[in-house]
Design a protein with these regions (language model features):
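Active-site-proximal, substrate-binding regions of enzyme catalytic domains
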Residues: 2-109, 116, 125-127, 150, ...
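Acidic, PIN/NYN-like endoribonuclease modules and their adjacent C-terminal/linker elements
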Residues: 119-176
Length: 176
């Protein structure tokens, strides 16, 4: 386990709730924070099994729900900060993604996010980025799960979207 901080967006939380694997992020990173906006997104209209998994994971401390971080980027004429603030205001990002990215930027944390546009913004802001598939690979490498493929198959069967090429590339890279 690393002593790093991980900021989770809603997509991976939903995926891990469907798999009943919400403990994996904290087992790998130690500290996992979820913004209030992301928490509202994942608990607003979840499937019943997802809600039970999310509530149980929060109660045992798998993650901490924290206030949204409204960063004051760009107030001091820093052009790189201005550019990062502009990325956070991308209308293609939903409020949860914006709040997760703002907190990750403010804390220099890794951001756990699946949505393509959010990942692109994180990369542009030079944040460490991890997705659900990458988290599952790390969990396998750490001996926390035996195989990735059955979990990916279960996610896809549940209706969770993962790009076919990304899945194929990821599974091929680990020999599954």
């Amino acid at each position: 386990m690393s002593a790093a901080l991980l900021i989770a967006d809603s997509g991976p939380l939903i995926a891990l709730a469907r798999l009943q694997r919400l403990s994996l992020p904290s087992e790998l990173f130690g500290k996992v924070w979820v913004t209030e906006t992301v928490w509202d997104e994942v608990t607003r209209q979840p499937r019943v099994d997802e809600l039970h998994a999310l509530m149980a994971a929060q109660q045992v401390g798998s993650f901490l729900v924290v206030p949204d971080h409204h960063t004051a980027l760009g107030q001091h004429g820093d052009s790189s900060a201005d550019a990062r603030a502009h990325l956070l205001s991308d209308p293609g990002l939903d409020p949860g993604e914006q709040s997760a990215l703002a907190l990750a930027l403010a804390t220099a944390a890794t951001v756990l996010i699946d949505e393509r546009r959010g990942r692109a913004c994180a990369v542009a802001m030079q944040l460490p980025v991890l997705g659900t598939l990458g988290l599952l690979v790390r969990a396998r490498d750490a001996g926390l799960i035996e195989r990735v493929r059955p979990l990916v198959d279960a996610l896809l069967a549940s209706g969770y979207f993962l790009g076919q090429m990304l899945v194929a590339r990821t599974l091929a890279s680990i020999g599954e």
